[in-house]
C-alpha cells in the first residue's frame, strides 16, 4: 500500500506511467594514460588532499627542525632541498610509467625500486672511483636525459615487444636517476655538516612527494618539466 500522502500505486489495466523526457548526464572526457583518473570529474586537487598534505609537511618541518637544528643553518644547503624534491618526484614518475607499460603489480613495482637502488649504487661507485665533470656538465646531461624522456611518447614503447620495451623504459627512467645521483654525490662531498644537509634534503623529498599530486591537474608527463625546473633551481 502507498505511504500516507503518497500518490497511489498504478493498478493493472490502468494508465501506463512513463517518463516524458530522457535524462542524460554530462559527457565526461575518458581517462588517458597520462591522466589515469576516471573518477576525477574535473582536473583538480581535492581540498581534503590539500589539508592532509599541509599537515604532513608541517609535521615534517617540525621534526626536521628538532633533528637538524635552526633553519638559519640550512640556508646554505637549499639546493639539496630542490634535489630531494626533484628526485622523489622522478621516482614517483618512474613507478607510474612502469605501471602503465607493464601493469600495476608488486613485481613491476619491485623492478622499479630495484632499478632505482641499482642506479643509486652505480652512481655512488662512479663518484668514488672516477673524477666527475664540472657541475654544469652533469646538470646539462641530466636535463638532456629528462628532455629525451619527455620526447619519447608512451605509445612508442607500448608497440614494442616486452623485452625491448623493458630495456627502453629502463634506459629512459633510470638514466636521469643515475645522473641525478652523480650530481648529488658531487654536491654532498662539499658539505660541512652532513646531518643538516640530510635534513634539508629530506624536507625537500617530502615537498616532492606533495608535488606529485600536481598530476591530478596536469597529468604525469608534465612532472618531467617540474623535475627539470627543480634541478635548474638547484643548479643556480
What does each of the following model-derived ranges do?
Residues 1-236:
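Alpha-helical transmembrane segments of multi-pass membrane proteins
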Amino acid at each position: 500500500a502507498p505511504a500516507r500522502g503518497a500518490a497511489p500505486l498504478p493498478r493493472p489495466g490502468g494508465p501506463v506511467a512513463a517518463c516524458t523526457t530522457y535524462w542524460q548526464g554530462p559527457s565526461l572526457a575518458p581517462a588517458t594514460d597520462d591522466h589515469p583518473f576516471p573518477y576525477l570529474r574535473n582536473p583538480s586537487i581535492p581540498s581534503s588532499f590539500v589539508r592532509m598534505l599541509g599537515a604532513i609537511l608541517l609535521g615534517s618541518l617540525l621534526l626536521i627542525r628538532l633533528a637538524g637544528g635552526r633553519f638559519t643553518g640550512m640556508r646554505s644547503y637549499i639546493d639539496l632541498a630542490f634535489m630531494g624534491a626533484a628526485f622523489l618526484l622522478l621516482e614517483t614518475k618512474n613507478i607510474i610509467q612502469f605501471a602503465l607499460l607493464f601493469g600495476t603489480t608488486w613485481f613491476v613495482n619491485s623492478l622499479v625500486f630495484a632499478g632505482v637502488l641499482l642506479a643509486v649504487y652505480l652512481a655512488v661507485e662512479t663518484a668514488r672511483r672516477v673524477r666527475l665533470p664540472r657541475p654544469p656538465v652533469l646538470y646539462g646531461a641530466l636535463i638532456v636525459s629528462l628532455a629525451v624522456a619527455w620526447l619519447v611518447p608512451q605509445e612508442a614503447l607500448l608497440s614494442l615487444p616486452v623485452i625491448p620495451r623493458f630495456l627502453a623504459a629502463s634506459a629512459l627512467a633510470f638514466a636521469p636517476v643515475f645522473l641525478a645521483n652523480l650530481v648529488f654525490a658531487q654536491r654532498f662531498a662539499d658539505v660541512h655538516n652532513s646531518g643538516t644537509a640530510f635534513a634539508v634534503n629530506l624536507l625537500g623529498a617530502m615537498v616532492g612527494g606533495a608535488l606529485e599530486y600536481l598530476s591530478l591537474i596536469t597529468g604525469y608527463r608534465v612532472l618531467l618539466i617540474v623535475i627539470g625546473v627543480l634541478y635548474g633551481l638547484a643548479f643556480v
